[in-house]
């Protein structure tokens, strides 16, 4: 079986600064399958995507005065905010938010975790299959959202924050 995956980043990226990954058409919709999730009233385009994004995050324990970014929820990873992974260092809180509707930019918290393991590699997998978004943390399914339709065009991936 041929591996159809694409490596977007092959080295460590620090999250104390914003890094934008230019992906330029690396994820494409399947033109042969018209699809719009059921119950979706505001989606004008039809989308059918099947993809997975795997990433490893290592968060060091730092004192609260390390950076202003530690005092607020700071993006660790964002794929056009569909989803966006945020971390608040002062309270060791982690959350995943996303825009559930293409026509409404309101963000919804779909997962929250207190006490994310520090000084340990945490493995995240974002799996999208024709309207269902599954997110795994360290091999455990933590989110499964149905009827989600991300708009994927030439979107960039953001890692870290200023």
Label every PLM stretch briefly:
Residues 1-162:
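Extracellular glycan-associated modules
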